[in-house]
Amino acid sequence: MSETPLHWQTITTLSQQIHRGTLSPVALMEHLLDRAEALDGTLHAFRLIPRDRALAAAQAAELTLRAGQDAGPLHGIPFAVKDIIDVNGLPTTAGSHLLQDNVVSANATVVERLLQAGMVLLGKAQTVQFAFGAPGINHHHGTPHNPWHATPHVPGGSSSGSGVSVAAGMVPMALGTDTGGSVRIPAALCGTVGLKTTVGQVSRAGVFPLSWTLDSVGPLTRSVQDAALVYQAMRGPDPADPSTHNASFQDVLSGFTDGVRGLRLSVAESVFWEETDPDIVSAVLRCGDVLTTLGAHVDSLAFLEADEALAAASFGLIGAAEAYVDHLERLGERFDEYDPIVSTRMLRAKDATPMDYLRAIRAHNALCHKAQRTLRDVDALLAPTTMIPSLPVSEVDSSLEVYHQWNSRYSRNTRVANMLGLCALTVPCGLTSHGLPIGLMIMGKASDEAMVLRVGHAFEQATDWHHRTPDLSWAE
């Protein structure tokens, strides 16, 4: 069997070679930079790639390792960040021309922690404008091209470039943010792993906000083990983010390989399955069979059935209202300069009253508590990450009304975890009859990232879906 090319390897295997001295961080960075620059004219995954800076960082990582200063398993590993996350000396545009000159002077906390762990930045990935859209479309900076189809298909959003950059082998990890599915949707549609962290586990300081109630930061990777390594490095309290002050933090690597024998895993019923693509239904149900074979007790659970309408309405109001207020403070009344697919959603909150917002927040808090009670005796929930696979951009973006319909469909399943305060992981679990990726969503209790990562790793070890890669001969 031929050796796996560097660009398809996981952080774990790359790290082993770097620490053995058989792979130079500089050689790895050069390989990935060359690949990104060769493909990105077609795929549009990146907002910017500062090549000289990336190579200098890789050289520094190599020199410190030679000097015996080993920062750990992430030392010398390239990564990308969604362009709403601050990187010192680079612009954070949030996918909008209105912020094209917004060069920042400090790193976001998550970036600083990954740099301290030895990682090296390759570039900033494209995003939906202001991180507000599930299909991944951006009319101002360009829509990243899902690498699994030669005809333009949606990558999922809003961490669109993050999903494409990992799926196309440009970087082994990219940071995204998740307010209603923005890590998990592109991960599922592009065939990667994506972790939605519990609010308070990972600092959001230095991240352009969408919703201070619902925003979270998480990695997109090639394997669950990689996601665990990155999460372990970036989680923890931060004085600059009050949401982290009262959180408890697990060692997610302890027990990571314990498997699922004896665990109760419940297939979430009700809304998660309505009008879902038949290929997705079949693939996700087969996941239950795999986990049963591994020793888990797999059953079904009526989840959210009576509260789905309340959760959806409250989620929509919280997200739109908090975004609207924040944008008024930052950019003023310039909504006519926004992409209509974004401004029309924000402006829905213009006529909302303080009482409407407070009711939505109260519903959010009540649903979070109810979810924790419901899941008291359940280790994790299983569901399709999305109800539909990636579709042609021309179909999703044919009109503003049609776009909003597809936007709601893409986020229908994922937004549940955000509204209920859960953590969630998506892992590749199949391909449709058209060869497009399918994601299994594993949801866990608040701050129980260790469990969803453990279940995801066990599933991944028993299957080979995370090893599947797109044929990119049409893009090279």
What positions do the PLM features span?
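Glycine-rich, small-residue loops and helix-cap segments
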Residues: 21, 32, 76, 116, ...
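Acyltransferase
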Residues: 22-30, 59, 278-302, 328-333, ...
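Acidic/His- and Gly-rich active-site-bordering loop/insert found
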Residues: 54-56, 64-141
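Short helix-loop capping/hinge segments that flank enzyme active sites or metal/cofactor-binding pockets
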Residues: 74-94, 259-268, 317-372, 384-388, ...
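A short helix-breaking turn/cap at a secondary-structure junction
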Residues: 196-282, 287, 308, 457, ...
